C-alpha cells in the first residue's frame, strides 16, 4: 500500500458531470495513486483493432447512453485494480460503478481479496440540472483525448493546454444523449448505491457544485492526505 495512505482502493461516485474524474486526476498527480477511469479503458478497447468484437459491440451502445454489461466492467476494473495493488499503489476508481448490482459485485470482490475495510467511497454530489449544464459545455481534445471539465473560462478555450490539439464537444455529450445518460445514471440511480455503501463501508460526501480547487481541498481532507 502507498506510504501515508490508510486506503488501498478509493471509489469515486457521482453522476455524469460531477467532476469525479477530475478529482481522481488531481490525486493521481501523486505517483503513489493510480487513476483507473473505466470510461477511458472502454474507449481504449473501442479503438483497439485486436479487442474482442463482442466487447466492442457493447461499447457501441455505451456511446448511445446505455450502461456497459457488468461482466465487462468487472473484467476491466478488477484487472486494473490488481495491477495497481501489485505495484504498491492506491487504486482510484472513477466511473466504474453505475448500478446497485455492480456495487455489490465490487464489494464481493473486495471481500474475497480481504481488503473490504481498506476501501473508501467518495461521493461527488451535484444535481441532475447541473449535470446537464456541465456536460453540454465540456470539451475533449481531438489529439490526446484530455477531457476539459466545464467552467465558463474552459468553455471559451479552443486549444488543449496539454498538447496543443483542438478542443471539441464530445460525441456522447450532445443533448439527446446526455439526457438519456441522466435518465439511466442520474441521482435516482446513484442514491441506492450511496446508501448501500453507507451500510457496508466508509462513505464521504462532498458538494461537487463548487469550484474544482475547493472540492479538491475537501477530498484531500476527508481522505487525510
Q: Residue ranges of each PLM-predicted region?
A:
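ATP-dependent small-molecule kinase phosphotransfer cores
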Residues: 38-113, 130-132, 170
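Conserved lysine of the Walker
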Residues: 20
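NTP-dependent small-molecule kinase module
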Residues: 2-5, 166-225
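Post-Walker A helix-loop "phosphate-sensing" segment adjacent to the P-loop in P-loop NTPases
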Residues: 28-37
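Conserved phosphate-donor/acceptor-positioning beta-strand/loop module used by diverse small-molecule
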Residues: 94, 114-138, 149-162
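Cys/His-coordinated zinc-binding microdomains
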Residues: 145, 164-167
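P-loop (Walker A) phosphate-binding loop of NTP-binding proteins
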Residues: 15
Amino acid at each position: 500500500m502507498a506510504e501515508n495512505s490508510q486506503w488501498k482502493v478509493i471509489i469515486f461516485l457521482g453522476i455524469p458531470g460531477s467532476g469525479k474524474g477530475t478529482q481522481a486526476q488531481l490525486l493521481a498527480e501523486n505517483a503513489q495513486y493510480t487513476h483507473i477511469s473505466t470510461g477511458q479503458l472502454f474507449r481504449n478497447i473501442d479503438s483497439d483493432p485486436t479487442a474482442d468484437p463482442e466487447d466492442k459491440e457493447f461499447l457501441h451502445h455505451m456511446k448511445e447512453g446505455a450502461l456497459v454489461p457488468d461482466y465487462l466492467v468487472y473484467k476491466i476494473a478488477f484487472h486494473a485494480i490488481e495491477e495497481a495493488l501489485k505495484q504498491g499503489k492506491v487504486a482510484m476508481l472513477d466511473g466504474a460503478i453505475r448500478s446497485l448490482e455492480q456495487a455489490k459485485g465490487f464489494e464481493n470482490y473486495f471481500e474475497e481479496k480481504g481488503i473490504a475495510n481498506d476501501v473508501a467511497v467518495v461521493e461527488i454530489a451535484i444535481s441532475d440540472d447541473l449535470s446537464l449544464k456541465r456536460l453540454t459545455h465540456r470539451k475533449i481534445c481531438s489529439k490526446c483525448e484530455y477531457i476539459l471539465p466545464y467552467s465558463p473560462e474552459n468553455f471559451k478555450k479552443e486549444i488543449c493546454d496539454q498538447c496543443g490539439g483542438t478542443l471539441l464537444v464530445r460525441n456522447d455529450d450532445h443533448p439527446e444523449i446526455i439526457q438519456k445518460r441522466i435518465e439511466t445514471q442520474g441521482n435516482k440511480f446513484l442514491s441506492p448505491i450511496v446508501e448501500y455503501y453507507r451500510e457496508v463501508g466508509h462513505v464521504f460526501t462532498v458538494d461537487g457544485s463548487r469550484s474544482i480547487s475547493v472540492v479538491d481541498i475537501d477530498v484531500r481532507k476527508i481522505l487525510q492526505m
